[in-house]
């Protein structure tokens, strides 16, 4: 399912912190994060049909 992201000091400018279960990634703020089947797959930052890896938060 889709994971909501929010602004955070732990992510660089233009990225929001996305928290899903045990994973925390920074995604561009125009994207949402999804971690695949039941949330146990690899997490990506999605926008329409395009995705990219999230970056690691600094805190």
From Swiss-Prot:
Q: Which UniProt keywords apply?
A: Disulfide bond, Nematocyst, Secreted, Toxin
Which organism does this sequence originate in?
Answer: Anemonia erythraea (Sea anemone)
Q: What processing steps or modifications follow its translation? A: Contains 5 disulfide bonds.
Its annotated compartments are:
Secreted; Nematocyst
Where on the tree of life does the source sit, at the highest rank?
A: Eukaryota
Output this protein's name: U-actitoxin-Aer2b
Q: What is its main location?
A: secreted
Recorded GO MF terms: toxin activity
